[in-house]
A protein has these predicted regions:
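C-terminal structural cap/anchor segments
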Residues: 411-415, 419-471
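Helical hairpin unit composed of two closely spaced alpha helices linked by a short loop
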Residues: 392-413, 418, 423
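N-terminal localization/anchoring segments of enzymes in phospholipid and broader phosphate metabolism
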Residues: 1-372, 377, 381, 421, ...
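Hydrophobic alpha-helix-in-membranes signature
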Residues: 50-53, 390, 394
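Exposed, interaction-prone extracellular/peripheral surfaces
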Residues: 374-378, 401-404, 408-409, 429
């Protein structure tokens, strides 16, 4: 018996030492990571409370990829030459910032300053940014809008674009009828990128429409998220491929298990590089009728024609190439579409300005959490009113403080979240913020007529944004997201009108309702809030 104890201790003691060493190494890694103090504390709490499970969770979901690039554009030769004027997303080398209007300004800079070719990258960027700032000022935008335009340009390189038309959709039937109509009218290319794509009734309709166009010679590329479409049947995929349709998976979990937490949440449909559909809607029948779980589904999508197409095209091509897709865009878009994008000149206040827009996108490996900055800046610049719609509401302390400061400054703020959740945990965590927000004068509403999936913010009826980004830390820090930003009173009023209609089927969460939340529920919600920074 004594010998057995010696043998066990011989194995157990070294194992314990290794175990504690791993925990210490992970704790140091967390402390040295570029993340918020709350996230650091949450991860350290998790690995010390649940050593084995916590360590596995951290290795799978906790590594901060903002400094360790998950993806990088794989372009060379003719690929880079053709798209050099489309790309400026997620990188800062000077060869890639000279696209479209940046390229225009660089050429003008060379004409003005003969030493431009000898300037350093930082000097060139500074010169170009100065010219861009002057252009934005000369357009005559109000300071409130101008600040956001400049921030997005400096953070992402996305330009202000002048667009011809838009149409907002507040229900899935109308949105997908429009997408299917545009697919039916496609002549050259169809590019679609979605987080969820099901083989249900809607999925079959879109599949059949795509196969029909592929047989007509239209070149089609489909980009699916590796997790959001993992249930897609082999037969469904085989039918698409047999028709000549190219399919790729973004961070397929079969090959990127350590990155399975980082998902492509974008929803983009590009038709002939002239039309883009984007917003909150995935390809699934529930987005039309609510499915089996919900009475109905409230969401927002938009159809746009105009200059903004170039920015969505750049995002799609980037994601496609980084998902192992072969480069074949030269034949697809060479000619009129790319030529028009290359020839774009800076917006001039003398020209007719229709619908001014910008794209904002970010992901776990982008230099800045730009979408979080966008939401924060919109709240900070508000003078009168902020309207927020999001199914999930899990902000960090910075955004909570921003909201409270705006409310205490006299800005009227209404926040609308879903009252019929699809996920319990974010719903519970959201409740933990209500007391301090209500105390600051912010109104909280829960949408009760089905599931609310819209992600919209409207400020002062002048600036608005909608897209894929929820008001939560997963969207800000972990997922790949994309939003359209509108500097248009017409579009902002359109979104506000729908917000007010949605209010009619909401219940207000006020102080009286707060008092009815039991101690048990408050404790449960607060426990889950502890780990919210790592969700």
């Amino acid at each position: 018996m004594h010998e057995l104890a010696i043998i066990i201790s011989t194995w157990v003691i070294p194992f314990e030492r290794i175990h504690y060493l791993i925990i210490i190494i992970l704790a140091v890694s967390i402390l040295l990571s570029d993340r918020s103090p709350n996230a650091m504390l949450s991860w350290i709490f998790t690995i010390f409370t649940f050593p084995l499970g916590g360590a596995i969770l951290y290795l799978l979901f906790g590594i901060n990829w903002r400094k360790n690039k998950i993806i990088s554009k794989r372009m060379k030769g003719e690929e880079k030459k053709l798209f050099s004027r489309l790309f400026n997303f997620m990188q800062r080398d000077v060869s890639d910032i000279f696209r479209s209007r940046d390229f225009f300004y660089y050429n003008r800079l060379k004409n003005i300053d003969g030493n431009a070719d000898k300037m350093s990258e930082s000097e060139i960027k500074k010169k170009i940014q100065g010219q861009i700032d002057t252009m934005i000022t000369n357009i005559g935008l109000p300071a409130q809008q101008r600040e956001i335009v400049k921030m997005l340009y400096r953070a992402e390189g996305t330009f202000l674009t002048n667009n011809d038309s838009y149409k907002l959709f507040y229900g899935g039937k109308e949105a997908f009828d429009s997408i299917l109509e545009d697919i039916g009218n496609a002549k050259n290319t169809i590019y679609m990128e979605y987080f969820i794509w099901r083989s249900d009734e809607l999925g079959e309709r879109i599949k059949n429409a795509l196969i029909k166009k592929a047989k007509e010679g239209v070149k089609i590329k489909l980009l699916f998220d590796g997790v959001g479409t993992w249930k897609l049947p082999k037969k469904y995929k085989r039918e698409l491929r047999n028709a000549g349709i190219e399919i790729r998976w973004f961070l397929d979990v079969k090959f990127f298990i350590s990155k399975m937490n980082y998902r492509n949440h974008r929803k983009i449909a590009l038709i002939d590089n002239k039309i883009v559909h984007t917003g909150g809607m995935n390809v699934g029948q529930e987005y039309i009728d609510g499915g089996k779980r919900f009475e109905s589904w409230r969401d927002t999508n938009i159809r746009i024609t105009g200059e903004i197409i170039g920015q969505y095209l750049a995002i799609f091509v980037t994601d496609w190439l980084n998902s192992g897709g072969k480069y074949s865009f030269g034949e697809d878009v060479k000619g009129e579409a790319v030529h028009e994008l290359e020839e774009q000149k800076p917006i001039d206040k003398q020209e007719k300005l229709e619908y001014l827009m910008q794209v904002s996108s970010s992901g776990p490996d982008t230099e800045w959490t730009t979408l979080k900055y966008l939401y924060s800046k919109m709240i900070a610049t508000a003078k009168n009113e902020v309207l927020i719609q999001s199914p999930y509401f899990v902000p960090d302390t910075d955004l909570v403080s921003q909201l409270k400061m705006a409310a205490l400054s006299g800005v009227k703020i209404k926040i609308m979240i879903t009252g019929v959740p699809d996920k319990k945990m974010p719903y519970w965590i959201a409740e933990t913020y209500f007391a301090e927000l209500i105390e600051a004068g912010i109104e909280i509403f829960r949408y009760k007529a089905g599931f609310l999936h819209s992600k919209n913010i409207i400020v002062d009826e002048k600036i608005s944004t909608m897209g894929t980004c929820n008001f939560d830390m997963r969207s800000f820090e972990i997922n790949y997201e994309v939003n359209s930003v509108f500097y248009s009173v017409e579009i902002s009023k359109d979104l506000k009108t729908q917000f007010l209609k949605d209010l009619e089927v909401c219940e207000r969460f006020d102080e009286a309702r707060l008092k009815k939340v039991t101690f048990r529920k408050r404790l449960r919600n607060s426990v889950f809030k502890l780990i919210s920074p790592i969700m």
